[in-house]
Design a protein with these regions (language model features):
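A short beta-loop-alpha structural element at the N-terminal edge
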Residues: 2-18
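Conserved GNAT-fold acetyl-CoA-binding loop/helix
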Residues: 20-45
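A short helix-loop-beta-strand connector motif used in the catalytic cores of GNAT acetyltransferases and
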Residues: 44-58
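Conserved beta-strand in the GNAT
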Residues: 56-58, 64-73, 78, 83
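Active-site beta-strand termini and strand-to-loop segments that position acidic
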Residues: 60-62, 145-148
Length: 148
């Protein structure tokens, strides 16, 4: 069973480490390099505990970290970042976590992917629990829907 919880300020270090794993996985697509300190970094991370429209979430399975979501609330709500550790992929963890996050914020949503990230596009097409519209922006596909 997947537990989705708001990431508390004292969980920032765990989330920062999960973001490093996410950035490492994503570097196959965006060709990002690590910084001189050996980290990819995520400059906006601290804003998720400061700005009221940003919300960080952690996913756990049996008490173990399994991934995260970073949500920017608005009209529409935006799934800014979403990551599931490889161990938990293709097991239903991602879909359950995504749907739990959508349920926390009823109303209009969007999920976005880069054109090169076809696996993410396929994932979101399965994970969105309602009918959705899909279009593309300059970076890739965007799904828009309303969560109840």
């Amino acid at each position: 069973m997947v537990e989705v919880s708001a990431a508390a300020p004292d969980e920032r270090a765990a989330l920062r480490q999960l973001i490093e794993l996410y950035a490492y996985d994503f570097s196959e697509l965006n060709r990002a390099d690590v910084g001189v300190d050996g980290h990819y970094g995520y400059p906006k991370l601290d804003a998720y505990w400061i700005e009221p429209d940003r919300r960080p979430f952690l996913f756990r399975v049996d008490g173990h970290h399994a991934g995260f979501a970073l949500v920017k609330r608005g009209a529409p709500h935006d799934m800014a970042e979403f990551f599931v550790l490889r161990k938990y992929r293709r097991s239903g963890v991602g879909i359950a976590a995504a749907r739990a996050v959508f349920a926390r914020f009823p109303g209009p949503w969007q999920t976005r992917q880069q054109f090169a990230n076809t696996a993410a596009t396929q994932f979101w097409r399965r994970a969105i629990p309602v009918a959705f519209d899909e279009a593309a922006n300059d970076e890739g596909p965007v799904q828009r829907f309303v969560s109840d």
